[in-house]
UniProtKB/Swiss-Prot annotation:
Participates in the translocation of lipoproteins from the inner membrane to the outer membrane. Only forms a complex with a lipoprotein if the residue after the N-terminal Cys is not an aspartate (The Asp acts as a targeting signal to indicate that the lipoprotein should stay in the inner membrane). Pfam families: LolA (PF03548). SUPFAM superfamilies: Prokaryotic lipoproteins and lipoprotein localization factors (SSF89392). This is Outer-membrane lipoprotein carrier protein. Monomer. InterPro entries: LolA/LolB/LppX, OM_lipoprot_carrier_LolA-like, OM_lipoprot_carrier_LolA_Pbac. Belongs to the LolA family. Residues 1-18 form the signal peptide. PANTHER family: OUTER-MEMBRANE LIPOPROTEIN CARRIER PROTEIN (PTHR35869:SF1). CDD domains: LolA (cd16325).
Amino acid sequence: MIGLFLAAPLVLSSAVWANPQQELSSRLSLVNAFSANFDQKVVSPEGDVLVEGKGDVTIKRPNLFRWNTVTPDENLLVSDGKTLWYYSPFIEQVTAMWLKDATEQTPFVLLTRNSASDWDNYNVAQTSDTFTLTPKDTTSTMGKFVVTVAKTGEVRNFSVVEQDGQRSNFKFRQFSKQVPKANIFTFTPPKGVELDDQRN
């Protein structure tokens, strides 16, 4: 009888975590708009910190986001729902690409879409509040994508792990569920900058 009681938590746990893909999607769907500040660390395969940075991010699902890096180098990533704009003031260049083509370069796009068709391309594993996504396509150049999402839908941190083991870690602070204004997801290239338009 004691054995049955000991086994019960294992059965319940198995049921709760039966489908990590659905659990991730369900949690993300609880918060369809948020803003936060972030801290970034790029860590080498050997564990050395290569780069540290800070910035802020604003998201409104589906497909709208503004990712503003303040340090070490100022740059801006904006999605207006169709086009992904990347602006680097230092080199005075803007790159434009279709958002649907940007997942390989910017895995964070997955969180802004929360699309079942996206998740189907990954093996999703769950450990508590942390989800690890590994591409099913063995020819993909993308490594693992690790994200921590609370049961309330709050995205707390995420990491992009390259195939060589280098890791980019992002930790969110001052998480707010306030719905952002629509105009912050628009972008017009400043006059005088070079435009690399990859949408053709």
